[in-house]
Amino acid sequence: MTEHTHDHGRGVLSQLAPEGRELKALIPGVYEGFAQLHTAAFAEGVLDKKTKELLALAIAIAVRCDGCIASHARGAAVNKATEAEVAETIGVAIAMSGGPGTVYGPRALAAFRDFAP
């Protein structure tokens, strides 16, 4: 495994947590609404939770959101995605986002490895 100087998994989520709690206290209704949307969108359905987390990970890479990458890398790991599945997901994200995907894709892989058993 390659050494890297930036946190991409747990470190990102830990860094964002205090600010997130602070903002949630200021606009609780928005956060409650988002939580309901998230629960509905990620509920088991025709697509299983693992597939939904992999989709979200690809989108997170494409929109260059480090917090989203960390969150959905964790979700992919929790839902038992394999490293090979994550790598293919990253490949699709690179195809859809171009050069930035080659920057954020490795971050996503590092984040997944941080959460994977």
Regions found by a protein language model. Give the residues of each.
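C-terminal structural segments of small proteins and small subunits
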Residues: 87-112
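Short cysteine clusters
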Residues: 65-68
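Acidic, glycine/proline-rich low-complexity segments that act as flexible tails and inter-domain linkers
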Residues: 1-51, 104-117
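Intrinsically disordered, low-complexity cationic segments
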Residues: 3-7, 71, 89
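Iron-sulfur (Fe-S) cluster-binding segments and ferredoxin-like electron-carrier domains
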Residues: 71-83, 112
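Immediate flanking context of iron-sulfur cluster ligation sites
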Residues: 46-63, 84-91
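Amphipathic alpha-helical segments within well-ordered protein domains
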Residues: 38-39, 56, 73-77, 91
